[in-house]
Amino acid sequence: MSEKQVKYPWWYGGAAGIFAVMNTHPLDLTKVRLQAAPIPKPTIVQMLRSILKNEGIVGLYAGLSASLLRQCTYTTARFGMYDALKEHVIPRDKLTNMWYLLGASMVSGALGGLAGNFADLINIRMQNDSALPLDKRRNYKNAIDGMVKIYKAEGAKSLFLTGWKPNMVRGVLMTASQVVTYDMFKNFLVTKYNMDPKKNSTHLTSSLLAGFVATTVCSPADVIKTIVMNAHKKPGHNHDSSFKILMEAINKEGPSFMFRGWVPSFTRLAPFTMLIFFAMEQLKKYRVGMPKEEA
């Protein structure tokens, strides 16, 4: 399609992510709380009621600054790299080929996961902090305060590398299942059902389907990442490995633990995916931030 030949600004993904997360942060917070909750796990409704009762409306936005920082790093990196690879690496006649797109998305997701790992660490800890006993709370005031406190208490390695392996895996899975499936579903709807590629109905349908796929594919890595990053660490000690956490969880809960919190994950990721791609399409449509000659 002709729009793929246009060079869009690298920051479109991050800007769209900020728009999406501003509208879905309470759902993300609920998902994190449920993934970190002990057995027996509450339902999504019970968790929401508990947050509202104990923390009020403000509690639903705990860790928002870290979520925004995450969009500026993780989302900007993975979307920017994905578009760059499509523009400079993938042959023009292969832009709808699933295998080429998967390769580009995996590289982009891995780099995005690594780039945004520190922000994700702060985000998860801030979102789950109020659910911890008073003596275990970290009490980060905001994302910057969280960075400083982690650096002082645990060191730079902990700040940038805690949970990086499951986070990179999740980044690969998320980008492949979210971005590629969006492109594939959109192309399918346009070519098979003659839907208008510029209409919002096409964008929203494609993104809803992509959100379902992404939630299911990413759930195992997402759960492990949340557990690893939320764990307390003493100076001089390493976190348990992701593999050890995986084995312990399987022994305790069975394989179903990998889909713990699937419903709140989908409840959050479906609207997030719809909003981020809707925002991306609007940015592209109006050529925001582009020179007039390109618009």
UniProtKB/Swiss-Prot annotation:
Quaternary structure (record): Homodimer.
Chain's role: Mitochondrial dicarboxylic transporter catalyzing the exchange of dicarboxylic acids like malate and succinate for inorganic phosphate. Required for growth on ethanol and acetate.
Keywords: Antiport, Membrane, Mitochondrion, Mitochondrion inner membrane, Phosphate transport, Repeat, Transmembrane, Transmembrane helix, Transport
Any one Pfam family match given in the protein's UniProt record, by short name: Mito_carr
Highest taxon in the source lineage: Eukaryota
UniProt record similarity statement: Belongs to the mitochondrial carrier (TC 2.A.29) family.
Protein name per the record: Mitochondrial dicarboxylate transporter
Cellular compartment(s): Mitochondrion inner membrane
First-listed, main subcellular location of the protein, grouped into a coarse class: mitochondrion
Topological category with respect to the lipid bilayer: Multi-pass membrane protein
Gene name of the encoded protein: DIC1
GO biological process, one term: phosphate ion transport
Disulfide bridge partners, by residue number: none
Gene Ontology cellular component list: mitochondrial inner membrane
Ranges: Solcar repeats: 4-88, 96-188, 198-286
Molecular function per GO: antiporter activity; dicarboxylic acid transmembrane transporter activity
Organism in which the protein naturally occurs: Candida glabrata (strain ATCC 2001 / BCRC 20586 / JCM 3761 / NBRC 0622 / NRRL Y-65 / CBS 138) (Yeast)
TM ranges: 8-24, 63-82, 98-122, 163-182, 204-224, 262-280
PANTHER family for this protein: MITOCHONDRIAL DICARBOXYLATE CARRIER-RELATED (PTHR45618)
InterPro entries (UniProt xref): Mito_Metabolite_Transporter, Mitochondrial_sb/sol_carrier, Mt_carrier_dom_sf
